[in-house]
Amino acid sequence: MYSSTTPDEDRKHARLMANILDIRYIEVSIDTISNEFFNITDTENIKKLDYINEDIFKVASGNLKARIRMSLLYYYANLKNYIVIGTGNRSELLIGYFTKYGDGGCDIEPIGDIYKTQLRILAKDWGIPEDIISKPPRAGLWPGQKDEDEIGLSYDKLDSLLYMIIDKNMDNDEIIKNIDLSIEEINRIRSKIVNSRHKVESPQSPRTSGKLI
C-alpha cells in the first residue's frame, strides 16, 4: 500500500521479500483515498482559517496514510477470514513510535518484544538481503522521512537506553555512566515511554461495577 511519498526502493524491497517468502501480494495506491479525504474535509481551507502550520499537517497526513493502510488491511483480512499481523518492534512500541489505530492496529505483534538492533542480527540469520537490513529505517509518510531523525537518536543508542531503563530499571545516575547521552536526552525518552502508554493499552473506562469487561 504505497503512496506518492513511498520510496521506489521500498516498493522494490517489498516485492523482493514477498517473492523470497513465496507470499501472494497485491499493490494498492492509497493516494486517491487520502486526496479524496482532504477534499471532503476541506483541508486546505481549514489550514488557512485555523492557522494550522505545515509541520502539524505533515504529521496528521502521515498518520492518515497509516490509518488508511490499516483499514485496507482489515478489509482484505475480513474478506479472507484472516488476522492482521503487525510489524512493530520493542523499540518502537516502548516509545510509541507508531500511529495509533494505524500501523499499531493489528491482531498480533510477532516481533513486538524484540529490539530493533536485535532484529538486525536475526535478519541476517533469516537470510534477509543486506540491502534491506542496512538501509535507514523509514515509513515513507513524507519525503525524506527517517525514523532516527524523528526519534532524535540512533537505534543503537535508543536500544541501549531502553534496555537500561526498562530491563535493568537503572536510574539516570547509573545510566549516564554507561552511555554517551545527556540527562535531557535520557529524560526525553523516559517521557516518551510514559506519555505513549495509551497507545498500547485498552481505552480507559469509568468503573461502575466490581468486574472488568
Model-derived segments and spans:
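Short secondary-structure boundary/hinge segments and terminal tails
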Residues: 35-36, 94-95, 140-141, 194, ...
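Short secondary-structure transition/capping segments
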Residues: 11, 38-41, 97-98, 143-147, ...
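ATP-dependent adenylation/nucleotidyltransferase module used to activate substrates
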Residues: 1-94, 175
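Peripheral terminal appendages
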Residues: 104, 145-213
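Catalytic subdomain that performs nucleotidyl-dependent activation
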Residues: 54-64, 83-160
